[in-house]
Regions:
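Terminal-tail/helix-coil boundary detector
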Residues: 2-71
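N-terminal presequence-like segments and the immediate start of the first folded domain
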Residues: 45-123, 127-140, 146-193
């Protein structure tokens, strides 16, 4: 550590600081928040944008088409099999996304942080939309259920960041959610043009 600190044992004069500021001013900032680099192109990794190395990015969840024309997406949680439902269903131009919690497989994600749980649930919703050929921009309605009403603002802020420019119809209510570890559950509806 001390060797690394010695590398920075120097002073910059005013001209050097100004030169650095001028270079930085020419940079294009990456918009968004931590984690956004994995949600929208360009997909930034430690190696840079790798999207040009693949012909197509695979969908997050497998889909199946029913005989009635419905397309179903399954995220693989234990709840889908147990209760007999799909993460999302597309019929015609309408997509309905089931109540979505911060669950990955059989594991709850986000601990006791309602904002982290809301972020993960919205990531799953976005994955379901992508699997059915849609985007978050096509969401027209969301419903948010919180276990503790005191968490409403933290959850609403997460929703606001993700839907800032989309502004779907929304309802947020307190509910006694299934599973003590879950603080947030979110439903969504989309219309694909």
């Amino acid at each position: 550590v001390m060797d690394n600190l010695r590398l920075f044992d120097f002073r910059l004069d005013a001209d050097s600081k100004k030169a650095i500021e001028n270079v930085i001013a020419g940079f294009s900032p990456i918009p968004g928040d931590c984690g956004d680099e994995y949600r929208k192109p360009p997909f930034l990794t430690a190696s840079g944008d790798l999207s040009h190395h693949v012909e197509a990015i695979p969908v997050p969840y497998p889909t199946t088409e029913g005989s009635d024309g419905r397309i179903k997406a399954l995220s693989g949680t234990e709840w889908e099999d147990l209760a007999g439902f799909s993460r999302a269903v597309k019929k015609g131009n309408r997509i309905l996304i089931s109540g979505t919690t911060a669950t990955h497989g059989a594991k709850a994600i986000g601990g006791n942080d309602p904002a982290a749980q809301a972020t993960f649930a919205l990531d799953k919703i976005e994955g379901a939309l992508q699997s059915l050929g849609a985007t978050m921009e096509e969401v027209v309605r969301t419903r948010i259920f919180v276990r503790n009403i005191d968490d409403w603002e933290a959850v609403a802020r997460v929703h606001g960041k993700r839907f800032k420019d989309i502004q779907p119809a929304n309802t947020l209510v307190q509910a006694n959610l299934v599973g003590r570890e879950y603080l947030v559950e979110i439903e969504a509806e989309a219309m694909v043009e």
